[in-house]
Regions:
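A generic helix-loop boundary/linker signal
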Residues: 13, 53-57, 121, 141, ...
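Short aromatic-enriched loop/helix-cap "lid" or pocket-rim segments at secondary-structure transitions
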Residues: 24-26, 53, 162-164, 174-175
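Residue-level signal for alpha-helical context at structural boundaries
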Residues: 58, 81, 85, 169, ...
């Protein structure tokens, strides 16, 4: 059945200490009884290294070994994990930004151009923006070569900034900051640990880098 509001995105835990859970609904009433299809992601550090394979099936028991005790009166992550149709496992890695995407009539787009930690939805979102920019320049430019150069000029620098930002100050920074300051002590008011002004500053800084802030979006529509 739906949890919290039925449209809640739930993050629990810190990557650098406990591991992290992320749960969110992606489809309502999948069975006629009001149940939702839930997507979940867990992250934890591991000494095991395997070559990157984005379609490798994982073992849910390996995941549960880290999160079996994570049960709450409003939410039961282990039960949701056990009911998964399948589990995929892959390394959370990026690559250093490169200086050039376009080579004659060939250019790069998406993860081929700027593989990044998928924070803030940017793993897929920036690929969509790449495609939109490339399409726009192919329609407007005098030649395909000119279009590819213009596309690279528009998209290379912004995506480079996001790749680097996701390494040092991703949206997870809010959780990590609160966890560090709370020092394993319970609190009733978030404002006692971090101010609203700090929360807004972290959020707005990331929005500006990603190009989601109000000023950037308004400029694109003018």
């Amino acid at each position: 059945m739906p949890f919290l509001t039925g449209a809640s995105i739930t993050r629990i835990g810190g990557l650098f200490t406990t591991g992290k859970l992320l749960f969110y609904p992606i489809r309502n009433n999948i069975d006629g009884d009001g149940n939702q299809l839930i997507n979940w992601v867990v992250e934890f550090f591991s000494d095991k290294y395997e070559p990157a394979d984005w379609s490798r099936l994982g073992d849910v028991n390996e995941v549960l070994a880290h999160f079996e005790s994570w049960r709450f009166d409003w939410f039961d992550p282990p039960t949701i994990m056990r009911n998964a149709d399948f589990v995929l496992t892959y390394p959370m890695v990026d690559r250093d930004p490169i200086a050039q995407w376009t080579f004659d009539r060939v250019t790069l787009l998406g993860d081929a151009a700027h593989p990044m930690y998928p924070r803030g939805g940017n793993g897929g979102a920036q690929s969509i923006l790449d495609a939109a920019a490339l399409t726009r320049h192919l329609v407007k430019a005098a030649s395909p070569l000119e279009a590819l150069r213009a596309y690279e000029a528009e998209r290379l620098a912004p995506t480079r900034a996001i790749v680097l930002q996701n390494r040092t100050a991703p949206p997870d920074l809010i959780i990590d900051t609160v966890e560090q300051r709370a020092n394993k002590q319970k609190f009733d008011r978030l404002e006692d640990v971090i101010s609203r002004e700090e929360l807004m500053a972290i959020s707005q800084n990331y929005q500006q880098v990603a190009g989601w802030d109000r000023a950037s979006l308004k400029a694109k529509t003018v």
